[in-house]
């Protein structure tokens, strides 16, 4: 790091976030862990041991883990690499390292009521009878895309974040169909738009231009 000493700018070694966290009662979370480069991941591997220490070669120093230091990571692929093509840029994680994670759990899509609660908490203007009905239908569309993805019917899926953006865009454009197109449908494969439009029609009772009923033969 560049620091000022005696009115002069000098470069000196400063401990980064990982060495600092190890020595303190900190819960350190690595987001998108499976996007890390393999050479970086090996640095972390030693820390994953139950009493793993961290060596700072620049200072010839060995750091002891604080008793209450904890490390967490989030991934999209559980370390197995991207088999779907949805998470380009992720890496396979060394199985020796995966073996050192003593707890692994999966967070699936939220229950309907919880997803509804989150969307409404971020969109206060829709926290009324009409708004709740629209949000409920948005979540139903999202659920159909998730089932369609699992069944192999479509290759793009709506996450809770997508539903949140859809609700936000509805508040801007005041048109639920247009908001759906610019939020999600425009990101989808042309060959799948008809299927996704059918999902929308089932939940809202309205046809989008991409729907099969509007396709002229």
PLM features per residue range, with description:
Residues 1-217:
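C-terminal regulatory/interaction module of P-loop NTP-utilizing enzymes
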């Amino acid at each position: 790091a560049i620091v000022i000493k005696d009115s002069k700018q000098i470069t000196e070694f400063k401990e980064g976030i990982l060495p600092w966290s190890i020595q303190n009662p900190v819960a350190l979370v690595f987001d998108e862990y499976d996007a890390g480069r393999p050479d970086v991941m090996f640095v972390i591997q030693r820390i994953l041991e139950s009493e793993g220490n961290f060596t700072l070669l620049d200072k010839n120093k060995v750091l002891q883990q604080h008793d209450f230091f904890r490390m967490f990571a989030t991934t999209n692929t559980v370390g197995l690499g991207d088999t779907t093509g949805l998470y380009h840029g992720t890496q396979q994680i060394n199985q020796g390292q995966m073996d050192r994670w003593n707890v692994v759990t999966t967070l699936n899509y939220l229950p309907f009521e919880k997803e509804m609660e989150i969307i409404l908490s971020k969109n206060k203007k829709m926290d009324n009878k009409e708004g709740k009905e629209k949000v409920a239908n948005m979540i139903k569309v999202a659920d159909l895309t998730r089932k369609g993805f699992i069944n192999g019917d479509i290759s793009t899926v709506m996450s809770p974040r997508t539903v949140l953006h859809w609700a936000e865009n509805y508040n801007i454009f005041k048109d639920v169909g247009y908001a759906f197109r610019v939020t999600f449908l425009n990101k989808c494969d042309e060959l799948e738009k008809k299927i996704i439009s059918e999902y929308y029609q089932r939940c809202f009772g309205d046809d989008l231009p991409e729907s099969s009923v509007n396709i002229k033969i």
